[in-house]
Amino acid sequence: MDKELELVEHKASILIDALPYIRDFNQKTVVIEYGCAEWLSGVEEQRLMQDIVLLKSVGMRPIVVHATRMGLDKFRENKRIAKLLELCGVKAIGICGVDTETIGLMLDNDYIPVIVPNDIDNESEYIDPRETALEIAEKMQADKLVYLSKYPGIYKDEERKDIYYKITVPEVEKLRKERNFPKEFDEIIGYG
């Protein structure tokens, strides 16, 4: 019974810590880009969908931008992700490309927009979802832009014991000067 009480107290503590953020981000638009789902297991992807639904349930307005694995039909993948969100209890609908009027209508009508990047002539097999997410965030005047990655994060030290959970652009610039980061780092943060 003591373990159960500890767990309840721990969860209550987390909620109390989160309350100011919940209040601050009520009705704020958050664009979430998560690249290809291939680096997520089924369980991890389901947890991600639950986290997105949690953001929605506390009053945020999430917009999901995703990539499509090479060789997969982008519309089928888009529909699959929207369905995963719906299975978590929210309304979600997939669209292709950046149409801010449609995205705004979807948000206003309590839907989570699920967006796959699209090239106008449909000749490109892959369009970087990070660029699409950035474009949507700018055009929708989003309050937050979140890039999810298979990498654990930016380590605070060379021993790789602790990561940044929040980092500013000036801090990133300083780290780039101080450390030798792999090429993937620049690609992830948009310098590549």
Spans of model-derived segments:
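Ligand-binding beta-strand-loop-alpha-helix segment within the catalytic cores
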Residues: 71-120
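Glycine-rich phosphate/pyrophosphate-binding loops
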Residues: 140-158
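Alpha-helix C-terminal capping segments
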Residues: 54-58, 135-143
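Active-site catalytic microenvironments in core metabolic enzymes, especially phosphate/sugar-handling
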Residues: 45, 51, 58-61, 65-83, ...
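Polyanion-binding loop/helix "lid" in catalytic or ligand-binding cores
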Residues: 77-86, 117-134, 163-192
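Generic hydrophobic/aromatic pocket-lining and core-packing "Φ" positions
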Residues: 49-52, 103, 133-134
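N-terminal glycine-/serine-/threonine-rich phosphate-binding loop
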Residues: 1-63
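Structural motif
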Residues: 29-33, 63, 112-117, 121-122, ...
